[in-house]
Amino acid sequence: MKFLAVLLAAGMLAFLGAVICIIASVPLAASPARALPGGTDNASAASAAGGSGPQRSLSALHSAGGSAGPSVLPGEPAASVFPPPPVPLLSRFLCTPLAAACPSGAEQGDAAGERAELLLLQSTAEQLRQTALQQEARIRADRDTIRELTGKLGRCESGLPRGLQDAGPRRDTMADGAWDSPALLLELEDAVRALRDRIERIEQELPARGNLSSAPAPAMPTALHSKMDELECQLLAKVLALEKERAALSHGSHQQRQEVEKELNALQGRVAELEHGSSAYSPPDAFKVSIPIRNNYMYARVRKALPELYAFTACMCVRSRSGGSGQGTPFSYSVPGQANEIVLLEAGLEPMELLINDKVAQLPLSLKDSNWHHICISWTTRDGLWSAYQDGELRGSGENLAAWHPIKPHGILILGQEQDTLGGRFDATQAFVGDIAQFNLWDHALTPAQVLGMANCTGPLMGNVLPWEDKLVEAFGGAKKAAFDVCKGRAKA
C-alpha cells in the first residue's frame, strides 16, 4: 500500500506540473496581440488611404463614425474651426492583423522578449521538475521514518502492561487515510507526527509506571531483552550439552557393540572347540570344502566377522568341476545395504570378474582344466589398485576399482555362492562346483615373493584377518568338509 501511495503522489505531482506549464504557456500565445505599440491611436490605424483591403474597410468604418460630428462649411478657413471632440472609435478595440512581411523594429524587440519569456518558462518548468523529485525523495524518507517509528512503537508497547495497551484500532495512522487522496503528503506528515507523539508518550509512561510499582520494573524493554538473551544462552548451552551427551552415547554404544561382537566371536570359537573337542584335522588347516553339484543351497559360511578394511589380499586353492560352462562364485562377501561388497565371479562364457562395491574389473585367470590352482587377489582403496595372481605368477593388474571406498565391516562371507541379499537369496546359475581349500585373508597387499612362496609350498602363511581353520568354517546344504593336504594334492595332480 505504501508503494501504491508513492506512485499516486508522483502521478499527481506530474499532473500539477503539466497544468502549471499549460497555464504558463498562455501569455506566449497571446503575445502577438501585444506586438502592437501601446501608444498607437486611431489616427495611425486609419492614416493611409491606399492600404490593404482590411485597412480600407476600417477607414470606411472610421468615416462613417465621423460623419455624426459637425462639418466645416465650404469657404470657411480650416483654422477658424474648433476641432470636434474626440469620439471613441471601435477600431481601437479590434484585433487588426498585421501583414506577415512587414518588418519593423517593434517586432524584433517583441521577438527578444518572447525568447526571454520562453527561457523564463523553461527555467520555471525545470524548477517544478526538481521540486517534484524533491517531493518524491521526501515521500521515500517519510515512508522509511514511518516504518522505523512503527517498529519502535511496537517494541515500546510490548514493554507496557496489558492495561496500557490500546485494545481498539489505532487512529491517526496511515490506515485511516485514503491512499489516492491529493493531500497524501500532509497525511504522511501527520502520521509521522502522530507516531512520534505516541512513542514519546509511551516512553514517558514506562518509567512512571515502573516508579509507581514497589517491585523491580520488569516491563522495561532492556530488562525484557536481557532476560530473553539470558534464557536463549541457557537453552543453547543445554542443547550443546545434549548434543555432546548424545555423541558420547553413540560413540560408547559403537565401542560397546564392537566389544560384544568380539566376545560373541570368542564364545562361538570356544563353543566350537567344546563341541568338536580338538580339531578333526591335523594341522587345523588340512581340510577342504566340496560342493559336488550346481545348486542354490550348498555352501560354506565363515563364522568370523570381518573388520573395516582399506586393503586386503585373498588367497585360496580351487579346483573347478564345472567344465566349460563358467566357474561360478568361489566366494562372496556382503554387508548391510550392499550385497556385492566383494565378489569373485565367473558367469557363463564371461571372463572371471572381481566386484568391489558393485564396481567391476575383469581378471585374466583361467580355472577350466579341472586342476588345482592357487589364486590370489590383492586390492587397496588408494587409487583402487588391484593385482591378480595364478599359481604364483602375476597375471594382471589395474586401478580405479572402487577407489577410496573402504570395505565395510560386520558382513557375511560365503564360499561357493553369490549373495543377492545379506547371507542368502542364492542363484544356482552362479554357484561354484568343485573344491575349495586354504582360503586366507590379510588386511594388506602381499608381495609377489610371498604369493609365490605360498603357491609352491615353500613359505606358507596364515591370514591375519581370517585364517583357514576348521573351527571357523561351517558347511551347509550338503556341502562337505574333508581332510586334505593342499601341497600333496597339488603334487599328485
UniProtKB/Swiss-Prot annotation:
Main location (coarse class): membrane
Extracellular side: 24-493
Biased composition (Low complexity): 57-72
SMART domains in the cross-refs: PTX
Annotated region (Disordered), positions in chain: 37-72
Keywords linked to the UniProt accession: Calcium, Disulfide bond, Glycoprotein, Membrane, Metal-binding, Receptor, Signal-anchor, Transmembrane, Transmembrane helix, Ubl conjugation
Cofactor note: Binds 2 calcium ions per subunit.
Positions with a binding annotation for Ca(2+) 1: N340, E418, Q419, D420
GO cellular component, one term: glutamatergic synapse
Subunit architecture: Heteropentamer with NPTX1 and/or NPTX2. Also binds taipoxin-associated calcium-binding protein 49 (TCBP49/RCN2). Interacts with KLHL2.
Function: May be involved in mediating uptake of synaptic material during synapse remodeling or in mediating the synaptic clustering of AMPA glutamate receptors at a subset of excitatory synapses.
Name of the protein: Neuronal pentraxin receptor
